[in-house]
Amino acid sequence: MADDNGKNPMPNDRGYDTLLTAFNNLKLYANYNHQEPGESGNTNINSNNNHPNPPLLTAFKSLKLYANKNNQEPGESGNTTINRNKNHPNPPLVTAFNNLELYANYNHQEPGESGTTNINNNNPNPPLLTAFDNLRLYANYNHQEPGESSNNNYPNLNVYNVGHISAASFNAPPFTPSSLTQPDDSSSRYSGKPFPPPPLSFVSPGVDKDRNWLSSLLDMMTCAQRFTEFQKYLQDLDTYPTAERESHLFKIGSALTTTKRIFLHLATNQYGSQALRILFRRSPSLDHLLFCAVDTNFFLLMSDKYGRGLIIPAIRAVDKTKKESLYKLTYEYTLHLARLETGCLALNNVLQEIRGIYRDLIFECVANNADWLSFDPYGTHVVQNILILQNPVATTAIAERLRGSFFRLAMERQGSYVVEKCLKSDFARDQVLEEFRGNAKEWVRMTTDKFGNFVVQSALRVMKEKEMRPLLREFVEKLRPHFGKMEIGRGRNTLRVIQEEIVGWINQLPDKSGYVN
């Protein structure tokens, strides 16, 4: 609609560009014979058999068909009543047209006016694209006019047709607890109700067959009572000719990874996770599908009790390039995983497999954050694991990061384990002993502490093992004035170690340490 001056109004800043694109595409194909959408000559618009997009052309024709139900053109003002006809044979298509008309008229232009070609170029609106898709969905699906009684106008709802699935659909909606039937509720952290069956008229016989096959497969993989059936099923597949076997395995992999919900339902189930691990390294194509699913859902799997068991099999089943993809994800999520109860365990397991630059980067990341990770109830396990691995650079960096905190760590449950592992490491021991040596008061206090007394015992035994006689004598002498008090409470454990293991040894062996009196 033009304004009083005969000019089209300026586009509004709140335009809907996506819907505009859909409308312009419609107009583009309608103009294939140099006709404007809404012109009377447009009734023969699909007579051109060489039209570049027949489905879109059909959609436009369907618009015209319903717009003409009241002898109105798709751009006439009277068209606003089109959805008030409750007896219209196809309300969804009418709604789609009205949505198209609504956004096309956003700047008070009729859908057939030439000004519509540049309507609101700054206008994003996915709902318009949805409206356009609805046009294609309902318009003449099987060469029938929308509104005919045949139910074939609807596309087949092929829910689990494995012939049409691939790894391309991994980017599914956010994960929610599975609503698949749980054949054994106790074997999964989720439980739910079965999927409601679709209307029978929407489901073809082939879909029923595929759906039943997938349902049976999932049942075998997640049910404790049927798990042996799944193993037998794979053994039978191994007897097939190579090509047929590969085809069946690819079908299985496609079915299990086509949606995020199905894959995570299996991966987070006790038996489902075990079944997925069995599938690795049976076929290159199957390995690729499973790896892509693991890669896409990496963090969710690493933080799940059963899902974390899939990471190492996935790493071992693929080539170096794909391995590094998981290595990189591990590095990126290091600190997030380290603070999770399951994530810290999964991270430690993966560290046993990682090689190359990402291993060093993870070590560096943990070392740089060791001052707070060591006090974290879960992060401390990651720090301890790196200390056990005895990487010289990482261990030295951790010890330097913890300098000044060893007494405080020694008197906390999780921190005491970190200090003990530092004492047992050739790359961190000196830093710990230096701090203990410089504060006699705290050294004595540790002997009666609930957790610190174990650190004192460990320090004494390490110095004996490493034959550091002068230094060991120095530490014992600092405790001697307090032996009486140590006979009561937790100090008696340290006193027993000194009397039974240390005192007699001090004067027997030559000193082999670098320390001097």
Curated annotation (Swiss-Prot):
PROSITE patterns: PUM, PUM_HD
Localization (cell): Cytoplasm
Limits of the PUM-HD domain: 148-502
GO cellular component, one term: cytoplasm
Keywords for the protein's UniProt record, in alphabetical order: Cytoplasm, Repeat, RNA-binding, Translation regulation
Record field: compositional bias (Low complexity): 42-51
Domain notes: The pumilio repeats mediate the association with RNA by packing together to form a right-handed superhelix that approximates a half donut. The number as well as the specific sequence of the repeats determine the specificity for target mRNAs.
Name used for this protein in its record: Putative pumilio homolog 21
Organism encoding this protein: Arabidopsis thaliana (Mouse-ear cress)
